[in-house]
Amino acid sequence: MNARVALQLSGIERHYGEGDTFLPILKGADLTLRSGETVALVAPSGTGKSTLLHIAGLLEHPDEGEVLVNGTSCNGLSDDRRTAIRRNEIGFVYQFHHLLPEFSALENIMMPQLIAGLPKAEAAERASALLDYMRIGHRGSHRPTELSGGEQQRVAIARAVANAPLILLADEPTGNLDPETAGYVFEALEALARQSGLAALIATHNHELASLMDRRVTIEDGKVVELK
């Protein structure tokens, strides 16, 4: 694959606690994601799955190792610079949607675009197009509490890619949904990632859904291991 490297994690180590409470989570984890590639992270709870995603998304610092986003080393960067890279290059989807309850679905998707400085009319147009792509264009004026769980998560996915990030990270994005809804949301997420040409790392417990991805990896003894 000749696509450019969007995200590279090298020798990532992360532990919590000190002394008697010392708990190593990641022990020299390596992972490379290329543009247009979808990768499923299939690992049990407690193995460091969320920690790896948080480090990849610049939400957490590793104790050792290097994180490169689009070729830029994020080690030693100021918090402001890390925040700028995260906003411009990375979209994040959580198991729980974290939508702003006082705003409509359309406004929630517009929000990151407005923060990035996009004119309101352009932000609204892109938000509307994303809602249409996720097949919930007719729900744009509804607030999160008026949406089903699947609809809420589709809005969250649209919000995550609103600024056309290079990388999409998702931590159990369908874990709180029924199997049928989870399947549709996961397929929509995977299709959106492919169409946008971004690099996607999606954590899931569901091996059937993970099989839709280009690659599957897991975490064993603190290291990222490729699954066949």
UniProtKB/Swiss-Prot annotation:
It is a peripheral membrane protein. CDD domains: ABC_MJ0796_LolCDE_FtsE. Keywords: ATP-binding, Cell inner membrane, Cell membrane, Membrane, Nucleotide-binding, Translocase, Transport. Its EC number is 7.6.2.-. SUPFAM superfamilies: P-loop containing nucleoside triphosphate hydrolases. It is found in: Cell inner membrane. One of its GO terms (molecular function) is ATP binding. One of its GO terms (cellular component) is plasma membrane. One of its GO terms (biological process) is protein localization to outer membrane. Residues 7-227 form the ABC transporter domain. It is an enzyme of class 7 (translocase). It comes from the Bacteria. The complex is composed of two ATP-binding proteins (LolD) and two transmembrane proteins (LolC and LolE). Belongs to the ABC transporter superfamily. Lipoprotein translocase (TC 3.A.1.125) family. This is Lipoprotein-releasing system ATP-binding protein LolD.
